Every structure is written in C-alpha cells, then in structure tokens.
Amino acid sequence: VAVRLSVLVAAVALAATGCSSPGSASADAKHPAGTVLRVPQDFHTVQQAVDVARSGDTVLIGPGVYRESVQVTKPDVVLRGTDRNAVVFDGGVRLVNGITATGAGSVVENLTVRDYLANGVLFTGVTDQKLQQRGAGGSAYDPLDTSRFPAVQGFRATRVTTYDNGLYGIYAFDAHGGVIEDSYASGQADSGIYVGQCRPCDTLVRGNTMAHNAVGIEITNASEGVSVLGNLVTGNRVGVTVNSNDQEALAPQHGAVLAGNVISDDNATDTPEQADGGFGIGIGIGGGTGDRVQRNLVQGNTAVGVIITDPPGHPASGDQVTGNRVTGNGEDLVLAAADPSNCFSGNQPATQSPAGLEGLAGCGANGASSGASGRGSLPSGRAASVQAPSGVPFSQVPAPPAQPSMPDPTAAAVPATGLPGTVDPDAYPLPTDSGAVPAAH
C-alpha cells in the first residue's frame, strides 16, 4: 500500500491539533498498520517519510543518492532500499552519522551508507543526539549511564553495504536482541562491525564480509549471547577483537562465541591506521572472559593468528580456543595472559608462544584448562614483531564491489522482534578454505 504524501500530511496535521472529527478517523483509516511509505514518490527525503511512519510501517527507498542523516525514533519501523547498490546514503565526509535507530525493533536493509564522519548505521539506546554526534560511546569515549539510557530492544541490519566512514560501519551500542547479517563493510577508520556495552546482548553477527577496515569486527564490553558466526574477515589491519575496557560501561566482557569464521590476511596496507597501532592480528582477546573461539580458519596474519592478553585492570580468564585451523601466521597461537584457566586445544598450529602451549594449557573434557588447578603461570607469549605501515585516509579507500541485493524488495517487511531467535554455533563447521563463507541467510 503506497500512501500519498498529501493524505499523510493531513493526518499528521489533524493529530497535531487534537481534532476528533470524523475526518481524523478517515485519515487514520488511510494509514493502516504496515503502510509502505515510498521515497521519492511520496516524500522528497527519507527523514520526511520516517517522521510520518508509524509502528509497523516500511519506508521503501528508491534508487538515488540521499545526502542526509536519518533518525529513526519510533518502534518497529523498517527502512529498506529497493536496490542495495543503487540506494546510497552519502555523508560527503561532512555529516556525522548516516542512519541512527533508537526505536525498538528497527530494521535497516538493502542499501548502502558511505562517507560519514562517524558511523554508517547506529543502533543504540542512547537518545541524546549530542552523544550520538560523538559516536554514542566506543573506545574513544567515556562510559555512558545505562540507567539513563537503557538498551534499545530489537534491531536488525541485513544486506547493508557500508564503507569509508570515520568510526564504525554498523554499530550496535547499548542495544539488545539483534542481528547483523549478510552485510559488507570496508574502509572504516575503526571497525566494520562493532558491538559494545550490552549485557545481555543476545546479538548475532553472521554471514558478513569485512575488508579493508582498520578492524574487521570488534566486541567490547558486550556479554552474554554474543555470537559471531560464519563471517569472512579478510584484508583488514586487525581481524576480530574481543575486549574489556573502562572506556565503556559493563566491563568485563564475557561469553562471546566465535565459530565458523574465516579470518585471513589481516595485514593489508591499503587500510586506515588502527588507533592502537595494531597490524597483522587475526583474533585478539584483550581481557575477555569465558569466550569460546572454535572451528575458525585463521591464516596469513603476519603478527599472530590468535592471541589472549591482559590489558590493565582486566585479566583474561576462562577463554577457550579449540578446534580451529590456525596456520601460516607470524605466530599461530599466543598466550600472554596470566590466568591458568585460559586454554588451547586442537588448533593445528605450526608455531606457539610460549613453546608447547597446547600441551601446557590444553583444554580438558569440560572445556576448562586441563592444567588450571596446578600448572601456575606460564611465560608470557609473544606475537611476531611487525611494524605497522602508514595507513590511508578512510575516505580514500576504494569502494567495494556491488553486493547481492534482496530478491524481492517489495516483500512484506518484518520488524526486529524476537531476535536473534535460535542460535546454534555447532551448525557452523570449520571452513575448508577462504571461499567457504559467508553464506546468505
């Protein structure tokens, strides 16, 4: 149902004046639940359509370049492009955020977002627009008040292409119950996908491709129900990081699962510089607790394949690295954390630091380190020494290739409720090669 602008404007005007005449009821009847609002046919800008939308509506966006920042504040609104590659939000390296969704159940799908100073797509419970302008949190910002800004409930990003943004491509911060899937992120000055400051998160990151970012996927102070499954993370400076820090609330991070991913060749020079100087790292756990890294293919990273470290004030503990294929990295496995409950088993490494790591800190039948009760601390392992080269400005990273679009963008839309649904990491086997993932959902 496409509703014309004049009808909707009349409905809004009547609501604003508090009119209770039969005309008001008639206008409501012409805006039934699930209305499709079309841009540019019915509205000149996306924000105009979003402002008129009600819960359960879809804003369907036709091909074009939209130079605007969009705020989605109402619940259960779906923002969808008719063509993933031809519907483009462009910040012109001038606007701060592309699409910011604070409404519960928001969906952003089948479109491209590029050249914003901060984030391409932001899902957050932080409703203060001044804080949103600063990125709404993240590694460069102070902790935010989770009582004042409770997590937004329900979000989804599907088939989103985001590139050349100054912080994050797709950013879920202070958000719960979501899915980020089948998306492509490149050229971000920080990370392609970032999940931060949530407990429980109940967030699924699956089937995405991360390339030519400073960091591919970043999980910070995000705990309970974080699943990173079946993604391709290649050609970044750093592949995947799982962190605890004091620059956001809800530390320490706990209980993420990384399974069935390919993390390869994360030492690309044609990328933005990583803020901490990281380069050539496949998977890095910095102060994470109770995380599981299993059945991932981790190869070709010049510094290290998988490393566990203790950042100041946040000792890593209870992390399990099992059943991966970690090969052809500067150092395949590195344990630089003191707690004996971290363990490594069955990862097929050629190199380990400290030497014999899997024998000294193997995982027992219950997943805990087989030597946790009596082994004591091991010598701290070290990654191979790598000098990070100079990077390129985020706005100058080449655009990614065209990506698969929705088969039928006119299909009925579904808000982001009841997510992520059943999540089964065991359904994601060890990839046989770098072409094995991602698989569309």
Predicted segment positions?
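C-terminal motif of bacterial Sec signal peptides marking the signal peptidase cleavage site
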Residues: 15-18
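Bacterial signal peptide processing site
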Residues: 20-22
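Acidic Gly/Asp/Thr-rich repetitive segments characteristic of extracellular carbohydrate-active
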Residues: 27, 32-61, 65
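Extracellular beta-strand-rich solenoid/capping regions of secreted or surface-exposed proteins
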Residues: 51, 65-78, 88-150
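Parallel beta-helix/beta-solenoid
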Residues: 54, 74-75, 84, 103-104, ...
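Short glycine/acidic-rich loop motifs that flank beta-strands on beta-rich extracellular proteins
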Residues: 66-72, 91-98, 117-123, 166-173, ...
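Acidic, glycine- and Ser/Thr-rich low-complexity intrinsically disordered tracts
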Residues: 327-329, 334-441
